[in-house]
UniProtKB/Swiss-Prot annotation:
Subunit organization: F-type ATPases have 2 components, CF(1) - the catalytic core - and CF(0) - the membrane proton channel. CF(1) has five subunits: alpha(3), beta(3), gamma(1), delta(1), epsilon(1). CF(0) has three main subunits: a, b and c.
Native organism: Syntrophobacter fumaroxidans (strain DSM 10017 / MPOB)
Protein known as: ATP synthase gamma chain
Alphabetic keyword roster: ATP synthesis, Cell inner membrane, Cell membrane, CF(1), Hydrogen ion transport, Ion transport, Membrane, Transport
Organism lineage: Bacteria, Pseudomonadati, Thermodesulfobacteriota, Syntrophobacteria, Syntrophobacterales
SUPFAM superfamilies: ATP synthase (F1-ATPase), gamma subunit
Function as written in the Swiss-Prot or TrEMBL entry: Produces ATP from ADP in the presence of a proton gradient across the membrane. The gamma chain is believed to be important in regulating ATPase activity and the flow of protons through the CF(0) complex.
Cited InterPro entries: ATP_synth_F1_ATPase_gsu, ATP_synth_F1_gsu, ATP_synth_F1_gsu_CS
UniProt-listed PANTHER family: ATP SYNTHASE GAMMA CHAIN (PTHR11693), ATP SYNTHASE SUBUNIT GAMMA, MITOCHONDRIAL (PTHR11693:SF22)
Domain of life of the organism encoding this protein: Bacteria
GO cellular component: plasma membrane; proton-transporting ATP synthase complex
Subcellular location: Cell inner membrane
A single GO BP: proton motive force-driven plasma membrane ATP synthesis
UniProt topology in membrane: Peripheral membrane protein
Predominant subcellular localization, coarse grouping: membrane
Length: 292
């Protein structure tokens, strides 16, 4: 049975752990506010850019002249970009993304496709480095402060790989931020580009645009930027999801520490009371023996 000193040592250790998790919760909350503001500012721009690309693509007579818009007749090579966090302590956040990626890669392999992985984030890269899948590239630090420059570097490389035939399709798995307590692992097809189509109700209310210069000239310039923007959007969403998941995990950990301290304190008091009772009984027993 644990001694009073052992129990007291455990209580002190749990209290120190609680202080650490509380501090990490506060740091995650501060980072979350900044990341969420950036995501919310960028999202309307990304949506409008997608709409422009859709309009331009509709006005082009021969979309086949654009490599980024043209599906391959036979898909044999798949590139997957997996976006995870660089650090842990965020619950099942990274695991959900990794599980989806592994299932996707295995499914494509079963179809006879050659699969390659670009790991954005240390956790995903570390996991697949120990597996049989080919990790073509690893990138870290992008979620600390997502930037257009970083997204463009990755996007240009993926576009080049697609144009020279090193991959027939490019997919991205990232965490879509739904709420403070819910983040959803999401699979997005990046290349070839297939702009989102408007619903019939949305089509009725939209205005017609006049484009200058021509649709073709604009598409040539804007299609690569569409890829960059989609990548940046996935980075923003995943960064916000990471901080929200870590804040929730640290809040739960702090709550668990408090409950454990209560339990240990109760155990400590019971053990101390039992010790005092035993000492009193020994004293009374000794006094009775002296009387005899």
């Amino acid at each position: 049975m644990a001694t009073l000193r052992d129990i007291k040592r455990k209580i002190d250790a749990v209290k120190k752990t609680s202080q650490i998790t509380k501090a990490m919760n506060m740091v995650a909350a501060a980072k979350l506010r900044g990341a969420q503001q950036n995501m919310e500012r960028f999202h309307p721009y990304a949506e409008k850019f997608n709409e422009v690309i859709e309009r331009l693509a509709e006005g082009v007579e021969d979309a086949g002249q654009y490599v980024l818009l043209t599906p391959r007749e036979e898909v044999k090579k798949i590139e997957l970009v997996l976006v995870t966090a660089d650090r842990g302590l965020c619950g099942s956040f990274n695991n959900n993304l990794i599980v989806m990626a592994e299932r996707f890669l295995k499914a494509k392999q079963a179809e006879g496709c050659q699969v390659r992985l670009t790991a954005v984030g240390r956790k995903g890269g570390d996991y697949f480095r120990r597996r049989t899948f080919e990790v073509r590239k690893r990138m870290t630090g992008l979620l600390n402060k997502p930037s257009y420059e970083d997204a463009a570097v990755l996007g240009r490389e993926l576009i080049e790989q697609f144009e020279i035939g090193e991959c027939d399709e490019v997919y991205v798995i990232y965490s879509r931020f739904l709420s403070m307590v819910r983040q959803q692992a999401t699979l997005m097809k990046l290349l070839p580009i297939a702009p989102a189509k408007k619903t019939e109700a949305e089509e009725k209310g939209r205005l017609e645009y006049l484009f200058e210069p021509s649709h073709e000239a604009l598409l040539t310039d804007l299609l690569p930027n569409y890829v960059f923007i989609e990548i940046l959007e996935s980075l923003y969403q995943t960064a916000v999801g990471e901080h929200a998941a870590r804040m929730a995990a640290m809040e739960n950990a702090t709550s668990n520490c408090k409950e454990l301290v209560k339990t240990l304190t109760l155990t400590y008091n019971k053990a101390r009371q039992a010790g005092i009772t035993k000492e009193l009984m020994d004293i009374v027993g000794g006094a009775e023996a002296l009387k005899k």
